Amino acid sequence: MSAPHTSSPRTAALIPAAGSGTRLGLGPKAFVEVAGRSLLARSVAALAPFVDEVVVALPAGMDLPAGVPARAIVGGETRQGSVRRLLEATEAGTVLIHDAARPFVPPPVILALLDAIAATGAATVALPVADTLVRAEGQSWGQLVPREGLWAVQTPQGFRRELLLQAHARAEAEQYAATDDAGLLARLGVQVRLVPGDARLFKVTTPGDLALAEALTGHVDGGWLTVEGEKR
C-alpha cells in the first residue's frame, strides 16, 4: 500500500532507536538480531509499505543496517528528545511513532490506526488488560486493582504532526517527561483514540522477550501467519 512519492510526505513513520538497551544487556537494543535480522530492520519493514517515509533516530556514530529503507538522524539524550528531533526532521502531516523493539506489527493494526488518526488526529494501539492486577506492598500482596477499563498501551501511535509538536514544546517548557507520546497529548486535553492492538506487539526488553521473539519468527518470516485467517 505504498503511497505515491511527493515532495512533501503525507505520512511518516518515526522510530526513536537511540536507547542503550541496558536491561537486555546486548548493546543498543534496536540492533539486536532476531533470527539474523535486527529489531530495527523488522520494524522498518513492517511500517514502510504504509507510509511515505521512515525516519530513525540512532545513537551518535551509528549507521542504519544495510538495506533498511529509511533515513537516519542522531537521537536525543532521552526517548522524548529523540521524538522531538524526529518531528523536526520530517514535513509529513501525519506521523506514526513506533518503538523499534516491537518488531511484529500486523498490517490490519496499522490500517486501523491510520483510519483512527484520519478521524480524530490522535490515536494509539492498546490492549485491554487481561491479567489480575495487584498493588504490591514491598514483596507482598497489597491491594487488588480492578482491571475494568484498563488498557496496556503499545505502539505504533499516530498523530497529526502539528498537534504532537505543540505537545512536545509544552512538555519541554514545563520540564515534563512522559513515557510515551499519547500521554503528552492527553495532558493537553486532546482525546486519544484507543485502537485494539495485538499480543504480538510486545516490546523486547528482557532475555525472555528475546527468546519469545526468536520463537515467533518461525511463523512470521516470509509472511504474516500466526493466527487463523491472516494472510501469508
From Swiss-Prot:
Organism placement in taxonomy: Bacteria, Thermotogati, Deinococcota, Deinococci, Deinococcales
InterPro entries for this protein: IspD, IspD/TarI, IspD/TarI_cytidylyltransf_bact, ISPD_synthase_CS, Nucleotide-diphossugar_trans
Gene label: ispD
Chain's role: Catalyzes the formation of 4-diphosphocytidyl-2-C-methyl-D-erythritol from CTP and 2-C-methyl-D-erythritol 4-phosphate (MEP).
GO terms of molecular function: 2-C-methyl-D-erythritol 4-phosphate cytidylyltransferase activity
Site (Transition state stabilizer): R23, K29
Name by which UniProt lists this protein: 2-C-methyl-D-erythritol 4-phosphate cytidylyltransferase
Record-annotated site: Positions MEP for the nucleophilic attack: R147, K203
Family note: Belongs to the IspD/TarI cytidylyltransferase family. IspD subfamily.
Enzymatic class: transferase
Highest taxon of source: Bacteria
Protein's pathway: Isoprenoid biosynthesis; isopentenyl diphosphate biosynthesis via DXP pathway; isopentenyl diphosphate from 1-deoxy-D-xylulose 5-phosphate: step 2/6
Catalytic activity as recorded in UniProt: 2-C-methyl-D-erythritol 4-phosphate + CTP + H(+) = 4-CDP-2-C-methyl-D-erythritol + diphosphate
Pfam families per record: IspD
